[in-house]
Amino acid sequence: MDTGAIVHIDYDLYNVGSGDLIETTREDIAKEHEVFDESRTYEPMITVIGDGRLIGGFEAHLAEAETETEYTFDIEPTDAYGERDSSLVETISQNVLMRSVSDPNMLGIGAPVEIGGRNGVLQMLRAGRARIDYNHPLAGTALRYTYTIVKVVEGRSGRVATLLRMNTGRSDFEVEFEADDVTITLPDSIAYDQNWAYAKFSLVRALREHLEVGVVVFREVHTPRVAAEEEE
């Protein structure tokens, strides 16, 4: 698969040691393993080959993959989330912990916590002390991927629309090209999206890196609002 290709991937991720399903994009697999979540949408993951969004072992395997072919392979911790690092397990006072959480009632062993801008997991809480593990939850874990590249996005407009969706989670933009320049008409409601300012700059960088576009124009259209006539 060529570097820079934008692809849709169905995948299942397992813990090699326990055999437990960690993640999946497929509803039937989630139900089979009794981890189905009604609140989420199961659909293929979208990624750009070689842009570093995924763990190293998966990126390397994707570079040699073909579409519509199912692969199953294992990744050692060094090519995934690294080995566990004992120096990332720290003991702090309970007072420091309590000052760092918004709702102490939600604390429990295994609960995620943020201390001084660092994300970790509460391992122990007793005698006025708390032990926090700042390792990635999958550090030291060998992983098994089963995946299929189900689609390669073709065409400039389609690739732009897909990058927009990747960066914003939305698909209600309008895309127009004039030579190498692109104009993107924004949906009205994006004005209320607090993440748009950051996503916009990330998107421009992605467009220039993966599509080599020229000028990028973000177009806002504000139409007059007409008051509804009163019912007689």
Report the location of each language-model feature.
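FKBP-type peptidyl-prolyl cis-trans isomerases
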Residues: M1-E232
